[in-house]
UniProtKB/Swiss-Prot annotation:
Coiled coil: none annotated. With S4 and S12 plays an important role in translational accuracy. Located at the back of the 30S subunit body where it stabilizes the conformation of the head with respect to the body. It comes from Polynucleobacter asymbioticus (strain DSM 18221 / CIP 109841 / QLW-P1DMWA-1). This is Small ribosomal subunit protein uS5. Part of the 30S ribosomal subunit. Contacts proteins S4 and S8.
Length: 172
């Protein structure tokens, strides 16, 4: 089994996006002549204002794998509408055997979330949130489950439009 090194690196490049490396795995391909070693990197990228992207990269060298992952994360960004530094409402996300429960929190709570979820909320610009991982804690699946849950979130205006009501009627 490949050894996993979990790293959280924070960089900010000239395009204003925040980058975090979540995990780097050493992977092995077994061929007739022996083993071929390589590295797989998992990263997240965000703009601090609700946009988030996840990327994976593989290469024979760590820096190349990380760069590939960052480039993929930049290409696959989604937009999540935030409300005062937290989420609109409680959401759940799932990917594989990983499930996450993400709830908004009041001011002063901070980010209460484990590992990969914390990195996502950091780069996304969420300042107050409570998140719980249920099931598998595999970093790849946790990141995908978190992004799945965030993509399911909708604003009061979207819900009002679906129901054919005003926002005031929805919020009560």
């Amino acid at each position: 089994m490949a050894k996993m090194q979990t790293k959280m690196q924070n960089e900010e490049r000239d395009d204003g996006l925040r980058e975090k490396m979540i995990a780097v795995n050493r992977v092995t391909k077994v061929v007739k002549g022996g083993r071929i070693l390589g590295f797989a990197a998992l990263t997240v990228v965000g703009d601090g204002d609700g946009r988030i992207g996840m990327g994976k990269g593989k290469s024979k060298e760590v820096p190349v794998a990380v760069q590939k992952a960052m480039d993929e994360a930049r290409r696959k960004m989604i937009k999540v509408t935030l409300r005062k530094g937290t989420l609109q409402h409680t959401v759940t996300g799932q990917h594989g055997a990983s499930r996450v429960l993400i709830s908004p929190a009041k001011d002063g709570t901070g980010i209460i979330a484990g590992g990969p979820m914390r990195a996502i909320f950091d780069v996304m610009g969420v300042t107050n949130v409570v998140a719980k991982s249920l099931g598998s804690t595999n970093p790849y699946n946790l990141v995908r489950a978190t992004i799945d849950g965030l993509s399911k979130m909708s604003t009061p205006a979207e819900i009002a439009a679906k129901r054919g009501k005003s926002v005031e009627e929805i919020l009560g």
